Amino acid sequence: MTQITLLTPDDWHLHFRDGDMLKETVPATARLFQRAIVMPNLLPPVTDAKMVIEYRERILAARPEGSDFEPLMTLFLTNDTTEQDIIDAKAAGVVAAKLYPAGATTNSDAAVKALDALFPIFEKMAEVGMLLLVHGEVTESHIDIFDREALFIERNLRRIVDAFPTLKVVFEHITTKEAADFVMSASDNVAATITPQHLLLNRNDLLVGGVRPHNFCLPVLKRNIHQEALRAAIATGSSKFFLGTDSAPHEKHRKESACGCAGCYSAWSALELYAQVFDDLGIIDKLEGFASIHGPDFYGLPRNTSTVTLVKEKWTVPSEIILPNGNPIVPFFAGEEVSWKVKS
């Protein structure tokens, strides 16, 4: 197959950041994706309805002229979140709330330290129809970074899912066989997003031949048996798995430093890279489900009606992009050849 037409896809997990960065990140996503779930881990985090409304307005203001791209907003859960916060956020159009264990990722220091205290919040979310999005890692310093996702499932996620069977839960950016197996065996109210980097790469691509900071993300890349498990999961065509890039921009100097930031900025190449993976696996016919159907169906939103066409044509991801402030950012797969391209 040398050409494929899909219903316009959505990105069910990304980071736009804020300020001038929005002038880069919003158009990058809006070029191909109709909707995106926008992460709330700003400084300060987006913890109430007023902050959500204001952030959404800033995103809309950064859309390209004529764009009808729709940001889907989320609330940042803390141990100070109240049931009224959930009610107000739902009224403001929030579709999901995000559970970050404190310290798990960029700007998550204010996040959840006492999970059980949030159980009344989860109950209210189930009642009003708000999804729970989970960054599934434990964060105690003595626990090996490669084991944190699997431990989170056993310590926390299984308890949440069992306690709130009507709560829809998205296990975001899964990276392990344990996560894929958990999602497959859980109820229909549990699903997962998978990033392009976790399908394309494993920890060798981060550490062999030198540290490669632009492949560094959280959750960190795992060994190849886990990469293969994720690839096997999408090959099933299961509606439990769908596209979430976790596109996470950081300026070049913040990645290429003695203590570099975590995140892969994949918005400019994500759909094409997913197509490459699906094609390599001989399942290109399953790409539309993963990219365009499973996500809206799980969220209870209408599928898009417009389409996008990809052709099998090689192109090279730019080595860097200049941000509105004049600083460079290195996109994911920079300088690499990609075998699928969006038909202009």
From Swiss-Prot:
The alphabetized UniProt keywords are: Hydrolase, Metal-binding, Pyrimidine biosynthesis, Zinc
Q: Which InterPro entries match?
A: Amidohydro-rel (IPR006680), DHOdimr (IPR004721), Dihydroorotase_CS (IPR002195), Metal_Hydrolase (IPR032466)
Q: How is the cofactor bound?
A: Binds 2 Zn(2+) ions per subunit.
SUPFAM superfamilies assigned to the protein according to its UniProt record, in alphabetical order: Metallo-dependent hydrolases
Q: Where does Zn(2+) 1 bind?
A: H13, H15, K98, D246
Outline the subunit composition.
Homodimer.
- State the family named in the UniProt similarity comment for this chain: Belongs to the metallo-dependent hydrolases superfamily. DHOase family. Class II DHOase subfamily.
The name under which this protein is listed is: Dihydroorotase
